[in-house]
């Protein structure tokens, strides 16, 4: 099976130093079996490489489980087609409203007010009775993820997040995919190393340009929704917009695409648990985002 070539050098250097795949697989299967709840696992499936491996491990371990995909409406079309074709048995969960509706009626998501994950991914599954959630989260992905426990209880949701491949490195993931001859989205072969929402406040620089060039329709729709939302009244009731002197929709789009990173340097990735305007920022500046 042909695997993406752009990271092979890195994977080979990792393989010389790290735990063999077989041991990682055995440990992950034991983890799933040890913590299996009587009613079974809720498996979060995104169609990316990590969730592909995680779902396969659930199948191999023969634990009771159901797989669910949060259909955000802003995932890459290539990814959505892949899920439909290769995983027709995965249950789709849809948000109450579209991403564009939430923007035009409330506000675009920001690094410090990232409502999109909750509204598009988490809320649709809240009423699901399966409270043990298996996720393909790996510590290697970011320092923020590495700092959190492998078994994590989310009190306000009454859910337990289980991370069977938490200690896996990227080469483990691709080696497993190769050994089991698993299909994966073609975007990986085109140079994309992580797949997620086409529109995201954490995209900047080269990655943002890649997304804009690859999926221009999404960005035209996004800008249309922002224009429907922005108005002089929005500016007048927003201390945040006043603070950054954002008076026009063009200035806002410039800020959204490029200046958020400078304005909120302490918010570095979308894995972070957001505490809006911590460290001296005035939380009241985000009141305009609270009524979503």
Q: What do these predicted ranges mean?
A:
Residues 179, 185-292:
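ATP/NTP-dependent adenylation/nucleotidyl-transfer catalytic domains that generate, transfer
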């Amino acid at each position: 099976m042909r695997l993406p070539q752009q990271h092979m050098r890195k994977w080979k250097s990792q393989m010389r130093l790290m735990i063999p795949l077989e041991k990682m697989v055995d440990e992950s299967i034991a983890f799933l079996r040890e913590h299996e709840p009587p009613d079974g696992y809720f498996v979060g499936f995104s169609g990316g490489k990590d969730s592909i491996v995680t779902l396969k491990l659930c199948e191999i371990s023969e634990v009771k489980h159901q797989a669910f995909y949060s259909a955000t409406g802003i995932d890459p079309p290539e990814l959505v087609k892949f899920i439909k074709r290769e995983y027709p048995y995965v249950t789709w969960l849809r948000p109450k409203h579209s991403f564009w509706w939430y923007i035009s009626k409330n506000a675009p998501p920001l690094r410090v007010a990232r409502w999109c994950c909750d509204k598009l991914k988490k809320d649709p599954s809240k009423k699901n009775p399966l409270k043990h959630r298996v996720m393909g989260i790996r510590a290697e992905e970011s320092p923020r993820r590495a700092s959190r426990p492998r078994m994590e209880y989310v009190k306000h949701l009454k859910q337990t997040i289980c991370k069977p491949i938490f200690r896996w490195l990227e080469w483990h993931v691709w080696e497993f995919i190769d050994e089991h001859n698993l299909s994966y989205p073609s975007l990986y072969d085109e140079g994309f190393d992580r797949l997620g929402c086409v529109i995201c406040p954490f995209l900047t620089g080269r990655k943002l340009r890649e997304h804009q060039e690859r999926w221009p329709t999404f960005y035209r729709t996004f800008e249309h929704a922002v224009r429907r939302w922005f108005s002089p009244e929005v500016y007048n009731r927003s201390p945040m917009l006043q603070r950054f002197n954002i008076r026009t929709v063009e200035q806002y789009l410039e800020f959204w695409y490029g200046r958020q990173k400078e304005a909120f340097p302490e918010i570095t990735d979308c894995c972070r648990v957001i505490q809006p305007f911590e460290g001296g920022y005035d939380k009241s500046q985000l009141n305009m985002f609270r009524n979503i």
